[in-house]
Amino acid sequence: MSNENRTCSFCGKSKSHVKHLIEGENAFICDECVSNCIEILHEDGNDGTPSESAGGEPEESGKLPTPAEIVANLNDHVIGQEQAKKALAVSVYNHYKRLRHPKARANVELSKSNILLIGPTGSGKTLLAQSLARKLDVPFVMADATTLTEAGYVGEDVEQIITKLLGKCDFDVEKAQRGIVYIDEIDKISRKSDNPSITRDVSGEGVQQALLKLIEGTVASVPPQGGRKHPNQEFINVDTTNILFICGGAFAGLEKVIRQRTEKGGIGFGASVHSKDENADITKLFGIVEPEDLIKFGLIPELIGRLPVIATLEELDEDALINILTEPKNALVKQYQALFGMENVELEFEEGALRSIARQAMERKTGARGLRSIVERCLLDTMYRLPDLQGLKKVVVGKAVIEEGREPELVFES
């Protein structure tokens, strides 16, 4: 073949249209295609000379935040729950430290520190997991255990969790394999009884078994983008061994199981006297939970064994809810003040109003999750009229607005 007729085997450009044409044994490549290849390798985080460890895994770069730094970051987003924050921070730090030092794992087998969060609705379980993933800059996905089914049943099978995780990082398998999965409502798939003679919730136990494989580490085959619409596409294999799983649930009724184990006396003069403060009582009981209590509640022993770190969250009291309304970076009061500020209007919540909002959330048993709906309801009419209220300078929300449904006080320019 003459020099003039030679073309790049990749883009088809002739020698006269490129600066350089590199000749191989049976092919040619131009300088432009070489540059494109280098760019692709850099985008994948690989410069062509990967530093592989003894375990065949690439070393990760960047500073891993210490447990104290992780807790400090969580404090910006989540109020209270100090013990849960510490437990999470240490577990997450050890998990990612383990991934960054694969050579150490060649001599000692380090187990994964998956986490079980136990706490009432609205106590901050989901927010803790989300904030952790954001701080560590890793892919994060949340799944609802109640929507999961065994393979062969209508609904989501557990491997769809991994499909969602892949989607969060543009189907980058390496990133997904170091992500965090939060499974909410794990208590809702417990079997109905620990007695084998009583009919069990087979579907719930089946989901637990399926989750067990995923959590302990397996190679999940998931469909690529498009899934069933492109049946001829090859499946993507994702190793879940290094994915950190955090499971959470309210575990309503678990306190009765713990109480049965801990109480010595049953009736008469030897019977235990319970605290009038039921919430404080439950928080104390959750603090002494043992794996055997969770088995009796309905989780299978194998699953509990794969969730070695158990962190309990406290019921939020009135003061904690007020702090949630006002203190975090994304506090509700700050959010609404920013929205009103866009209309050049100042928004003020009086102390009595904040206490009433917190009290209503406690009465509804919704914790921090119920705060937004209460605030939204009391400000709805004002926000509807806000763009049309000429000369409005300030809106004041008092106690009567929350408790009696009155309109907030409107202060106009004089």
From Swiss-Prot:
NCBIfam families: clpX, PRK05342.1. It comes from Neisseria meningitidis serogroup A / serotype 4A (strain DSM 15465 / Z2491). The gene is clpX. Gene3D superfamilies: 1.10.8.60, ClpX chaperone, C4-type zinc finger domain, P-loop containing nucleotide triphosphate hydrolases. It comes from the Bacteria. Residues 1-49 form the ClpX-type ZB domain. ATP-dependent specificity component of the Clp protease. It directs the protease to specific substrates. Can perform chaperone functions in the absence of ClpP. HAMAP family: ClpX (MF_00175). Pfam families: AAA_2, ClpB_D2-small, zf-C4_ClpX. This is ATP-dependent Clp protease ATP-binding subunit ClpX.
